């Protein structure tokens, strides 16, 4: 609240902030930011949401989303980042409630040498974690999942923003990583935790060696992802999709269910269900036989 008080008149200060969330996904009392017109992307924003925004957006947002509280500031994104880091530094801030309590490691878990697991994680029955892995705070690994050597789960990513003051800031990462049952994650892979929404990997997925899964990515069930695949933040990959070796997927797009993307492709637009793509940029081609059924 000290940071808010420094830039807002006392009359505009909220009495309390219950949490931080992404614009469009807030609940009453939660703080978010909006520094550009959201257009038709969001049909509604919960009444009682606290929105850091520019002066020019305040009237537009208030008219479009009745019941929200707009907090006009010169640089909403920068202030949101600063507030987030301030909250993360406070010991009282809880891990995302997406991870069920109690925390703990199931006694039957197999853990390799020199692996570090934060105490505020949940690891279910039958999980096998290899050597030299790091499992960060706020991770939930469900039953029967295998994580191979040198893998990092739940690390904060690098999502930089240069503020109006010229200072470069990195977004704080509040959310979790949720890995479903029966998943296999290859050696040297990095799964970044979400900023405000959890990074999720569905049941029975196979994630190859040396992959990078960005913040807030949502992967459905039985997705097959080969060696060296890169997936940008907030992308959704639906059930049964197959991504070949060294595929790169842009942030904030969707890969439809059952889609197949050939080796080395660069995907910059959303992909329809059951489509086959190949190339840079990826384009529609004839059927590709990839993944476990090739």
Language-model features and meaning:
Residues 1-102, 108, 144, 150-151, ...:
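Terminal amphipathic alpha-helical/low-complexity segments used for targeting or macromolecular assembly
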Residues 33, 98-285:
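Structural signal for interior beta-strand "rungs" in well-ordered beta-sheet cores
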């Amino acid at each position: 609240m000290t940071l808010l008080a420094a830039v807002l008149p006392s009359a505009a200060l909220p009495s309390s902030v219950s949490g931080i969330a992404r614009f469009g996904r807030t609940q009453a009392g939660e703080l978010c930011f909006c520094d550009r017109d959201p257009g038709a992307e969001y049909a509604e924003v919960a009444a009682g949401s606290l929105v850091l925004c520019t002066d020019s957006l305040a009237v537009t947002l208030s008219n479009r989303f009745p019941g929200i509280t707009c907090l006009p500031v010169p640089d909403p994104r920068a202030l949101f980042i600063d507030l987030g880091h301030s909250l993360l530094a406070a010991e009282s801030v809880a891990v995302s409630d997406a991870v069920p309590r109690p925390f703990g490691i199931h006694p039957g878990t197999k853990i390799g040498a020199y692996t570090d697991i934060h105490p505020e994680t949940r690891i279910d029955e039958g999980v096998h974690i290899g050597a030299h892995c790091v499992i960060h705070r706020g991770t939930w690994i469900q039953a029967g999942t295998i994580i191979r050597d040198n893998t990092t789960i739940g690390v904060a990513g690098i999502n930089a923003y240069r503020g109006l003051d010229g200072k470069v800031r990195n977004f704080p990462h509040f959310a979790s990583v949720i890995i479903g049952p029966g998943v296999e994650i290859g050696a040297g892979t990095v799964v970044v935790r979400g900023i405000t929404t959890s990074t999720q990997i569905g049941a029975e997925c196979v994630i190859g060696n040396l992959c990078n899964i960005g913040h807030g990515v949502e992967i459905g069930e039985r997705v097959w992802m080969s060696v060296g695949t890169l997936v940008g933040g907030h992308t959704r990959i639906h059930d049964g999709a197959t991504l070949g070796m060294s595929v790169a997927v842009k942030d904030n797009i969707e890969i439809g269910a059952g889609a197949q993307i050939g080796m080395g492709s660069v995907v910059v637009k959303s992909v329809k269900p059951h489509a086959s793509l190949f190339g840079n940029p990826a384009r529609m081609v004839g059927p590709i036989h990839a993944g476990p059924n090739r």
